[in-house]
Structure formats: structure tokens, C-alpha cells
Swiss-Prot record:
Chain sites annotated for binding urate: 78-79, 201, 218, 266-267, 293
Location(s), subcellular: Peroxisome
Enzymatic reactions: urate + O2 + H2O = 5-hydroxyisourate + H2O2
Species this protein is from: Drosophila subobscura
Protein name per the record: Uricase
MF-aspect GO terms: urate oxidase activity
Family membership: Belongs to the uricase family.
One Pfam assignment: Uricase
Length: 339
């Protein structure tokens, strides 16, 4: 959970309660409860909807007397923060991680006047409905997965779900009492992808430190981490926007299902994804993305020509360390960001 970044300019308090300058001062502080797990079930007729979150709440108080004096009178206990997660989920339900985080953060500021800042972190557990193909008898040959992009609502189960950890949906919300703007940052973590062709890397710096040859056709694999900040939280559909960003990343990486898309570098694919997000979702002000290059090297069959004659373009050695790391942040001009 990211700590609140702003530092207080208040002077330190002495042990007798009087504020006095010390040689040292606390420049940042806060506390909270992490890893609060909650499952919410919406039961509207026979069709149930679930949301499972892992929530962290951190508060920053105006006072530092709990640190300087051991005076706990302003502390909203972390156990109380944990209970608040469950109570607000029961009272208001859960629509999206971002809206629930906004609800929690605003609640802490409204209820406790001595809270200066609230920061809420939410991670979503990726449940999807079981589809009809998965509930049939196990005589069908295949991987047993359902193509969620090609099924209609009639084939989705009303109340049974399957855990599908393709990528993590998370958000961070920071609400400061003195700042009218609510900071909402949403992210994708751990989106692992691979394509077997249409990736090249050529014409890079050629000097005495280079050993890598030009690669005109290589395996391209990465694990995408991406986060973006909203400039407008009133008009955006958070869940739809998250899915749009994910789809944009996959489309720029993979291209058309039949012919694919050429990638001259990880950098170019990353930039095209970020640019399209800003083009398509006007509420996003800035987006940051990291794409580590997960290497797959050809197994050298030259010493084994009597066993496997010819070239090898089928067997590869996965190498996770060391790996390249490519990242960039793309922003609309003249906008401030907390990313």
C-alpha cells in the first residue's frame, strides 16, 4: 500500500503537550489496516453477482501526539477501519473497486474531523461466471476453458464462478481534506502475454559491448504492469474503462487474430498502447506502463546434427533472469499527476 506522500509543516510537540521545534521532526506519517478480505454477494433474483476484494485503508491524522507523546485519543483503531470495510459493504453494496475505495475514503474524512488524508488500496479477485460448456459431461476433448468472448448470457451460470487470474485489477484512492480533487489511480498487474512471430529488434547500437545479433523474427513475451490516473471521476465507468485498457494492450500486442501485427520493438508496442488509451478514454489524464522482456532463446542444435539435423525454430529455453525492462509514461499536456 502506497503511503500518503504529502508532508506536514507542523512543528514537533514536546512531551508536555506544547509544540516546540526539535532537532528532528516527523515529515510523513500514517497508519492503517492492510489485507482486509471481503466477499460481497448481490442476490437479485436467481442471478447472483460477486465481488471479492483485498482492501487496505491508511489514515493520516493532523496530530502527531500518538508518536510524540504516546497519546492514542485521536487514533481510529485499525480494527475499526477493518470493521468499516464490512459495514459499508453491507450498507451500500459494491459496484467497482474504485467506487468502493472512494466511498471508504470519503467516509473516514466525513466521520473523523481530525483525519487529514485517507488512502484506500483495493485489489480485485478475478472471478468469472462458469459457462455452459464447463458444466457438461467431461467427454469433450480440450483444455476445459470457456471462450467468454463468444458466448451469450444464456450460457452463463447464475451462481457458480471460476477463478481466472489473467490479470489483477487494482486501484488507489487518495482523498485529502485540503484538496478538492480526489486522486483515483487504477491499474493492471501481471498481464502475461506471448506471441511466437511478428516481433523484431534490429539496427540498434553496434559497438564493442554488443553481442546480440539483429533479430528479424523472435518470440515476444512480457508481463504488463500498467496504471493510469483519472482527471474526471464523475463520468467514467471504472469497470468498463479497465476492460478497455486491457483490450487495447492485447490488441496492440497481438493484432488481428489471423494476421497479427508487427512489433519493431517493445518500446513501440508500449507507446501505441498508451496513446490509444488516451485517445479512447478522455477521462484518463496520464498512463504509465512497464513491459519486462521475458526472453526465450533458441536451443542450439548445431552440436547435435546427427540426432536432429537442420535448423531449430521449435524448441526454446525460457530465461527469466536477467531480463530487459521497458517503461514509459504518457500524459496529456499541462496536467499534473500523482503517478
Amino acid at each position: 500500500l502506497r503511503q500518503p506522500s504529502s508532508a506536514s509543516n507542523r512543528t514537533a510537540a514536546s512531551l508536555d503537550g506544547q509544540e516546540t521545534p526539535f532537532q528532528y521532526e516527523i515529515t510523513d506519517h500514517g497508519y492503517g489496516k492492510d489485507a482486509v478480505k471481503v466477499l460481497h454477494v448481490s442476490r437479485k433474483g436467481p442471478v447472483h453477482t460477486i465481488q471479492e476484494f483485498e482492501v487496505g485503508t491508511h489514515l493520516k491524522l493532523y496530530s502527531k501526539k500518538d508518536y510524540y507523546q504516546g497519546n492514542n485519543s485521536d487514533i481510529v483503531a485499525t480494527d475499526s477501519q477493518k470493521n468499516t470495510v464490512y459495514l459499508l459493504a453491507k450498507k451500500y453494496g459494491i459496484e467497482s473497486p474504485e467506487k468502493f475505495a472512494l466511498l471508504l475514503g470519503q467516509h473516514f474524512l466525513n466521520k473523523y474531523s481530525h483525519v487529514e488524508e485517507a488512502h484506500v488500496h483495493v485489489e480485485t479477485y478475478p472471478w468469472q461466471r462458469v459457462c455452459q460448456e464447463e458444466t457438461k459431461a467431461s467427454t469433450t476433448v480440450g483444455q476445459g476453458s470457456c471462450n467468454f468472448s463468444s458466448i451469450d448470457n444464456r450460457s452463463l451460470h447464475n451462481h457458480a464462478f471460476i477463478f481466472t487470474p489473467t490479470a489483477l485489477h487494482y486501484c488507489d484512492v487518495v482523498i485529502x481534506r485540503q484538496d478538492p480533487k480526489q486522486t483515483v489511480i487504477t491499474g493492471i498487474k501481471g498481464l502475461r502475454v506471448l506471441k511466437t512471430t511478428q516481433s523484431s529488434f534490429v539496427n540498434f547500437v553496434n559497438d564493442e559491448x554488443r553481442s546480440l545479433p539483429d533479430q528479424y523474427d523472435r518470440i515476444f513475451s512480457t508481463v504488463v504492469d500498467c496504471s493510469w490516473e483519472y482527471s474526471d471521476t464523475d463520468t467514467v465507468n471504472f469497470s468498463r474503462a479497465w476492460q478497455q485498457v486491457k483490450n487495447i494492450i492485447l490488441r496492440n500486442f497481438a493484432g488481428d487474430p489471423q494476421v497479427g501485427v508487427s512489433s519493431p520493438s517493445v518500446q513501440h508496442t508500449l507507446y501505441l498502447s498508451e496513446k490509444q488509451v488516451l485517445d479512447v478514454i478522455p477521462q484518463v489524464s496520464v498512463i504509465s506502463m512497464t513491459m519486462p522482456n521475458k526472453h526465450y532463446f533458441n536451443f542450439d542444435t548445431k552440436p547435435f546434427q546427427q540426432i536432429v539435423p537442420g535448423d531449430n525454430n521449435e524448441v526454446f529455453i525460457p530465461v527469466d533472469k536477467p531480463h530487459g525492462t521497458i517503461y514509459a509514461q504518457l500524459a496529456r499536456k499541462n496536467l499534473n499527476s500523482h503517478l
